[in-house]
Amino acid sequence: MKSQEITKRWVDFFVNKGHTAVPSASLVSSDPSLLFTVAGMVPFIPYLTAREEPPYSRATSVQKCIRTGDIEEVGKTARHGTFFQMCGNFSFGDYFKEDAIKFAFELLTTSVDDGGYGLPAERLWVTVYEEDDEAKELWLKNTGIPAERIQRMGKADNYWSTGQPGPAGPCSEIYYDRGPAYGIEGGPLADETRYIEIWNLVFMQYQIENVRSKVDFDIVGELPQKNIDTGLGMERLAMILQGVENMYETDQVRPVIDKAAELSGREYTSAESPEDPHHTDDVRMRVVGDHIRSALMLIADGVAPSNEGRGYVLRRLIRRAVRAMRLLGVEKACLPDLLPASRDAMKGVYPVVETDFARISRIAYAEEKAFLRTIASGTARLEDAVAESKAAGVPLSGADAFALHDTYGFPIDLTLEMAEEAGLQVDEAGFRALMLEQRQRAQADAKGKKGGHADLSAYQELLGKGETVFTGYDELEGEAKVRGIVSGGRAVAHASTGDEIELVLNETPFYAEAGGQSADTGLITGDGFVVEVLDVQRPIKGLSVHKAIVREGEIGSDALVRAAVDRERRHAAEQAHTGTHIVHAALHQILGPEATQRGSYNKAGYLRFDFAWGEGLSTATRSEIEEVSNIAIRNNFRVDTKVMGLAEAKALGAMALFGENYGSEVRVVEIDGAWSRELCGGTHVSNTSLIGSLSLLGEQSVGSGNRRVEAFVGLDAFRHLAAERALVSELTELLKVPSGQLADRISSTLNKLKATEKELDRLRKEQLAAAAANLVGTAKDAAGVRVVAHDAGQVGGADDLRNLALDLRNRLGSEASTVAVAGVSNDRPVILIATNEAAREAGVKAGALVRLAAGILGGGGGGKDDVAQGGGTDAGKVSEALTAVVDAIAKR
């Protein structure tokens, strides 16, 4: 049974059971605490946790998910994949355990002809929470599965909670017995390779408090509304129904594996055991199949490669796939062959991967091209680092390996492999330590950005008192009541001068950072206190949290206050936000509708706008964007906002941020009607002339297939232009030319500088050649081998010595000859030895001689028999090292 048919049967079955079919949400989660949608229940969390009223009592979905926590296991097991589809059915206070169990058993065991999956009931095993006698009895009563195939497990395996106070409940999991060929008998408790989990039923029925860990908490009572949350792994079921060994061989992934095998000329054999000689290649092909599909789906949902967040995950997936292909022997660009194979396998379920393939492929191919350049430049840097480490006689440092990874994007496994080929070890422990340190810094930074508290219970308690009403569209100052004060993640009764707090009001004119617009700042005052608002965030939907510091007095958790936004700063932010919409419209007008928004940020006087585009913008194009934007500002276009249904907004052509999740009702911002029409919750000027002017700073790449423009607006734009005018004036004075001739004069000066550098390089080479000619006459016989041993003194670097040694070797002719030249560069001695073929036949090996000399110099080195390089720390022993080389040749 094909994957498309599996998902269709799922939806049809539950729709027939009274469920509403809900389309998959984007892989880009609307939950700010998640990078991606990681489970089928994520879009339903507000309903399952009773934060929002669900629009239906029963729902079903097939949700796209991404998880990369076990990325290193991909390809090695039958079950680990980064992209997967979770089939789910949900009940919000409607049916509970019995119907959930009956539905699951019915769908799994009903014959294929009657719309089910046709699994033999005798191959099904079930686990229940060890204390959930009710679930076991319901399985026995409704399915006929015997008691010996129902096993009990503890909280770690069969109890669901968020890890925070709130809803929780026991689980029941359904397993499929793959047969004795896959492991020992005894059910899931004995072997989860043979018995593979396919469906998890969560019975959300309890309220928990005092959470000490995921398995240590207090159950304080039953929920007034009991919910059902289930998830079936579509790929796992497909694996069973299609009779294949693992999820990678199902119909949505196998075509990519086959293409990888074709490109590499290797055979895919389904090898599972590391002892199998085909295992390594098969794992690499499975990695390619998995990662290419994940990359396809992420780009389709609006993610672009970058060095942080979601973009970094995408970049890593693409680069791991390309790296796996290189290890399979394919060094050319391979995504133009692999990505279409994945598109064709997925388009039946997700038509967007075909209709939007031009954009998807442009981004993916550009990322592969960039990575291939990275490998080329990283290889050169690695070779330098290897040479330096060899010269010093030490392993390649963890710092060097980390720099290659962090700066060049050079994979550590490639560093290890190439260093091993060069006969050099790598301080892998040092590299791992630096990687851990970087992750810890990133986690700390992310924690700070999200308010510093992973525990949202204090906010959820405050939300229980009511949502924060935002009044800032209509007023910048108003009366309000304090709903609560949070300090250190806990609610407090009051705060005094100097305390840093998070303040929640019943209503507020302060705009919370969202949609790319920075938060308002200002003052909250009352009887005897002054609080300065530094930032405003929404840690959970419906709650505005003012991050503030008490400047005077003491504020209580039920105080009456006056909230006043910094008007000048808000106006400057509104100038920037409306300016962002204008730039977006200008880009569409000049580049076309494919220049879609990928992100934005605006604050007082400044805007940044990221958009989909595959190449840099010319100076003329940038000038045109700036001109169109300023004409719109000068035309005094009216800016209007309207609230309407999402369908109506789309019908009007309102632009939305790709991959963003919107509610059923949206806010639309229009500039001169249809000239610019976007979904936006931010604040704006009332007409474009209030922006004053807009000055582009330039544009740059921000990842494959994406560009960024930056601009100043209003007074900041004037200041920017004034600074540029002053710079031009300074340059004209310095170079003694009119401003119109500046570019020509600077270009001429740079050309002269390049010519001078070229001449210096020519003279240096001539000096080396002259030195080589003079040194030929200094050759001495050492047991039948002519030897030139020369101390060059201070040198520019190892390249100078290499060029001198090779020139000398050529000048000495075919007679057995060896050249040893040494010098000091950056206070460290360097030695280079070159031998000709006759000398090598006479037993003279450059690598062995360099190790001898470098040992005397207090370091190490290595190389081949014909050319080798070394170095050390004791520059005072250069003469001794050269003498030792000559003696060794004479005594060989």
Curated annotation (Swiss-Prot):
<keyword id="KW-0694">RNA-binding</keyword>
<feature type="binding site">
    <location>
        <position position="577"/>
    </location>
    <ligand>
        <name>Zn(2+)</name>
    </ligand>
</feature>
<dbReference type="InterPro" id="IPR023033">
    <property type="entry name" value="Ala_tRNA_ligase_euk/bac"/>
</dbReference>
<dbReference type="InterPro" id="IPR018163">
    <property type="entry name" value="Thr/Ala-tRNA-synth_IIc_edit"/>
</dbReference>
<dbReference type="GO" id="GO:0005524">
    <property type="term" value="F:ATP binding"/>
</dbReference>
<dbReference type="Pfam" id="PF07973">
    <property type="entry name" value="tRNA_SAD"/>
</dbReference>
<protein>
    <recommendedName>
        <fullName>Alanine--tRNA ligase</fullName>
        <ecNumber>6.1.1.7</ecNumber>
    </recommendedName>
</protein>
<feature type="binding site">
    <location>
        <position position="581"/>
    </location>
    <ligand>
        <name>Zn(2+)</name>
    </ligand>
</feature>
<dbReference type="GO" id="GO:0002161">
    <property type="term" value="F:aminoacyl-tRNA deacylase activity"/>
</dbReference>
<dbReference type="InterPro" id="IPR002318">
    <property type="entry name" value="Ala-tRNA-lgiase_IIc"/>
</dbReference>
<dbReference type="InterPro" id="IPR003156">
    <property type="entry name" value="DHHA1_dom"/>
</dbReference>
<dbReference type="GO" id="GO:0008270">
    <property type="term" value="F:zinc ion binding"/>
</dbReference>
<dbReference type="GO" id="GO:0005829">
    <property type="term" value="C:cytosol"/>
</dbReference>
<dbReference type="InterPro" id="IPR050058">
    <property type="entry name" value="Ala-tRNA_ligase"/>
</dbReference>
<dbReference type="InterPro" id="IPR018164">
    <property type="entry name" value="Ala-tRNA-synth_IIc_N"/>
</dbReference>
<keyword id="KW-0436">Ligase</keyword>
<dbReference type="GO" id="GO:0006419">
    <property type="term" value="P:alanyl-tRNA aminoacylation"/>
</dbReference>
<comment type="similarity">
    <text>Belongs to the class-II aminoacyl-tRNA synthetase family.</text>
</comment>
<keyword id="KW-0648">Protein biosynthesis</keyword>
<dbReference type="Pfam" id="PF02272">
    <property type="entry name" value="DHHA1"/>
</dbReference>
<dbReference type="GO" id="GO:0000049">
    <property type="term" value="F:tRNA binding"/>
</dbReference>
<feature type="binding site">
    <location>
        <position position="684"/>
    </location>
    <ligand>
        <name>Zn(2+)</name>
    </ligand>
</feature>
<dbReference type="GO" id="GO:0004813">
    <property type="term" value="F:alanine-tRNA ligase activity"/>
</dbReference>
<keyword id="KW-0479">Metal-binding</keyword>
<keyword id="KW-0963">Cytoplasm</keyword>
<feature type="binding site">
    <location>
        <position position="680"/>
    </location>
    <ligand>
        <name>Zn(2+)</name>
    </ligand>
</feature>
<keyword id="KW-0547">Nucleotide-binding</keyword>
<keyword id="KW-0067">ATP-binding</keyword>
<dbReference type="InterPro" id="IPR018165">
    <property type="entry name" value="Ala-tRNA-synth_IIc_core"/>
</dbReference>
<dbReference type="InterPro" id="IPR012947">
    <property type="entry name" value="tRNA_SAD"/>
</dbReference>
<dbReference type="Pfam" id="PF01411">
    <property type="entry name" value="tRNA-synt_2c"/>
</dbReference>
<keyword id="KW-0820">tRNA-binding</keyword>
<keyword id="KW-0030">Aminoacyl-tRNA synthetase</keyword>
<comment type="function">
    <text>Catalyzes the attachment of alanine to tRNA(Ala) in a two-step reaction: alanine is first activated by ATP to form Ala-AMP and then transferred to the acceptor end of tRNA(Ala). Also edits incorrectly charged Ser-tRNA(Ala) and Gly-tRNA(Ala) via its editing domain.</text>
</comment>
<dbReference type="InterPro" id="IPR045864">
    <property type="entry name" value="aa-tRNA-synth_II/BPL/LPL"/>
</dbReference>
<dbReference type="InterPro" id="IPR018162">
    <property type="entry name" value="Ala-tRNA-ligase_IIc_anticod-bd"/>
</dbReference>
<keyword id="KW-0862">Zinc</keyword>
<dbReference type="InterPro" id="IPR009000">
    <property type="entry name" value="Transl_B-barrel_sf"/>
</dbReference>
